[in-house]
Design a protein with these regions (language model features):
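Structured, contiguous alpha/beta core segments that scaffold functional sites
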Residues: 131-222
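Extended, helix-rich architectural segments
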Residues: 1-154
Length: 222
């Protein structure tokens, strides 16, 4: 499927309404230079740019936002979680997933703690479950190569667009999701777009260039 520039960079109306708030929240959590760059101090009437910048640089900020979130997170995770996996308890790849949930060496507990931190900052975050699109002949080969589902945390400012469809029985399902996956050193943007049957990776050199579909894969999870 080909995409126009407008389609690739289009964002949901809720995204447009909230993206500035999300930027304020993460800069407030990071504090320091990030907060200064946000220029959240109110300007005085007739204040020159150099005077405003000097005032920004001279305004110390004790980062209570980060302290409160870290204290709350420590309280929530001070006791190890107890989980009942039910019928999944004998799943061969479960232990590998619990030990390395994101394929970056972080345990499931560590990923959930990070998700909780982001939820405290933004009000919510997204956990996307995906599986590498690698073909094997047998389940044994899949287990040997550790081909299994993994989790990715996506923060709200990177979830650009989505759509829910109502089924005949009245249930809503998510049938479209567009995520900004990466911005490269040259300013190009990689988008990952989920549909019920497929996942497309789209690249645009800039918001002035036509986007290109660089990969299409079956949606193995749905």
């Amino acid at each position: 499927m080909a995409y126009s520039r407008d389609e690739a960079f289009e964002t949901h109306k809720d995204y447009k309404e909230n993206v500035n708030l999300w930027e304020y929240y993460i800069r407030s959590f990071n504090g320091g230079y990030d907060y200064t760059l946000g220029q959240f101090l109110n300007r005085y009437n007739l204040e020159l740019d150099n005077e405003y910048n000097q005032r920004l640089g001279n305004t110390p900020c004790d980062n209570h936002c980060k302290n409160i979130i870290q204290i709350y997170s420590s309280f929530l995770f001070r006791v190890k979680a107890s989980r009942d996996f039910g019928a999944m308890a004998d799943e061969a790849s479960l232990e590998s997933f619990i030990k390395d949930a994101d394929l970056d060496g972080n345990s499931f507990d560590a990923v959930m703690k990070q998700a909780q931190n982001y939820s405290s900052i933004y009000g919510h975050c997204f956990l996307i479950l995906d599986k590498p699109n690698i073909t094997t002949n047998t389940r044994a080969e899949e287990l040997e190569q550790d081909i299994r589902p993994y989790l990715s945390i996506v923060t709200p400012e990177n979830v650009l667009d989505w759509n829910f469809k109502r089924e005949i029985n009245g249930k809503y399902i998510l049938d479209y999701l567009k995520v900004r996956e990466e911005v490269d050193k040259k300013g190009g943007t990689y988008f990952r777009i989920w549909y019920l049957d497929r996942i497309e990776t789209v690249y645009a050199k800039s918001d002035r260039d036509e986007p290109v579909v660089i990969d299409t894969a079956d949606n193995l999870i749905g």
